[in-house]
């Protein structure tokens, strides 16, 4: 007798996702499980059929072979539908469905849960110069390591952990809830399958101790605020042989007294005197490489921006550099002597006749005023 199509068995389309397949199987398994239908041969066959279909369609490799070649593409030894092995318990039928809820897959007694270690984050503050040029920094991070006294067993030297009497070493226990026999983490050993009657005095039975670890961090030139550097394997160690987590170093750049950063560009104010702005001249300005000279043309107005190309910050992902933007600030003189005040009064007096020619913004402003009152 030929087998029915697995998608037809579960009542799903061929493009159904994992969640839809799992939901369909769960519905059929609850309906036809032998624990609920002890005297029904038909229910037994339908349960076996649904289970076989689910074991193929829930496995990406088997599903791919089935989609290409049909039943002939699925190795019978991997199908899991043979009747000679007997039936699993109700919770075992739903092991992968309830695994996320109750800490592990059903039917896997005796296996300790393996977990990846937690990731760590370290906030590192650096100067703008260090961000621009790159740097190497030494940091100390809190971590946990295997206890050197008990070598990770958690037991006092000369003693050994014992098999948990509650779960018999399985790490999980079954709880009957109506029709369901649910498997969950053992409350006594917390899933390890062992208990420690005589804990290690240095780690308190944890098998791990807190330490400070020194690490060299290489900061690439051009790194920006909030960027993170990943150091694989420098997080907390895994559990039961699991891989360690990662360390993420998050960069924070201190405020600079002169420069403000905008991506790869730098901005700074460039104060100049009233006379230099009017007559022109040459002044020194700071850059990250040192002082540079810049020519100020006559009649320069406050707010004008001078761009120094390539004097910004190197892009962290390329060899290009940003620019340095110098914003002119014409300073009003203060603490004037009587002679200086007298000269300014003379300048004001001789400028009265053609003030608009000497003050372009004032001329523009007066034009707006005249237009306003003319309407």
Swiss-Prot record:
The J domain is necessary and sufficient to stimulate DnaK ATPase activity. Zinc center 1 plays an important role in the autonomous, DnaK-independent chaperone activity of DnaJ. Zinc center 2 is essential for interaction with DnaK and for DnaJ activity. This is Chaperone protein DnaJ. InterPro entries: DnaJ, DnaJ_C, DnaJ_domain, DnaJ_domain_CS, HSP40/DnaJ_pept-bd, HSP_DnaJ_Cys-rich_dom, HSP_DnaJ_Cys-rich_dom_sf, J_dom_sf. It comes from the Bacteria. SMART domains: DnaJ. Binds 2 Zn(2+) ions per monomer. GO terms for molecular function: ATP binding; heat shock protein binding; unfolded protein binding; zinc ion binding. The keyword Nuclease does not apply. Belongs to the DnaJ family. A zinc finger (CR-type) spans 134-212.
């Amino acid at each position: 007798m030929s087998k029915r199509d697995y998608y037809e068995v579960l009542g799903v389309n061929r493009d159904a996702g994992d969640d839809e397949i799992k939901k369909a199987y769960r519905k059929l398994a609850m309906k036809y499980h032998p624990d609920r239908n002890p005297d029904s041969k038909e229910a037994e066959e339908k349960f076996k059929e649904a289970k076989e279909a689910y074991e193929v369609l829930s496995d990406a490799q088997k599903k791919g072979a089935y989609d290409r070649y049909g039943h002939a593409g699925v190795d019978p030894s991997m199908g899991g539908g043979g009747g000679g092995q007997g039936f699993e318990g109700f919770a075992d039928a739903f092991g992968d469905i309830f695994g996320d809820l109750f800490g592990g897959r059903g039917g896997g007694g005796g296996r300790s849960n393996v977990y990846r270690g937690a990731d760590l984050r370290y906030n590192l503050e650096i100067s703008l110069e260090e961000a621009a040029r790159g740097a190497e920094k030494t940091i100390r991070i809190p971590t946990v390591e295997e206890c050197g006294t008990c070598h990770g067993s958690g037991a006092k030297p000369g003693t050994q952990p014992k098999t948990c009497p509650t779960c018999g070493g399985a790490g999980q226990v079954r709880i009957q809830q109506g029709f369901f026999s649910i498997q969950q983490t053992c409350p006594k050993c917390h899933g390890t399958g062992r208990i420690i009657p005589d804990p290690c005095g240095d780690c308190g039975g944890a098998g791990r101790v807190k330490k400070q670890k020194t690490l060299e961090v290489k900061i690439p030139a051009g790194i920006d605020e909030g960027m993170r550097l990943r150091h694989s394997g420098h997080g907390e160690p895994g559990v039961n042989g699991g891989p360690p987590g990662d360390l993420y170093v998050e960069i924070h750049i201190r405020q600079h007294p002169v420069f403000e950063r905008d991506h790869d560009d730098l901005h700074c104010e460039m104060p100049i005197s009233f006379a230099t702005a009017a007559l022109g001249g040459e002044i020194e300005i700071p850059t990250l490489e040192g002082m540079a000279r810049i020519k100020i043309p006559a009649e320069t107005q406050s707010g004008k921006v001078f761009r120094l190309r390539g004097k910004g910050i190197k892009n962290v992902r390329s060899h290009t550099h940003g620019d340095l933007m110098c914003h002119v600030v014409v300073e009003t003189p203060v603490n004037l002597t009587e002679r200086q005040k007298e000269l300014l009064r003379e300048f004001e007096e001789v400028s009265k006749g053609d003030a608009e020619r000497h003050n372009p913004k004032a001329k523009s402003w007066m034009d707006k005023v005249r237009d306003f009152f003319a309407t």
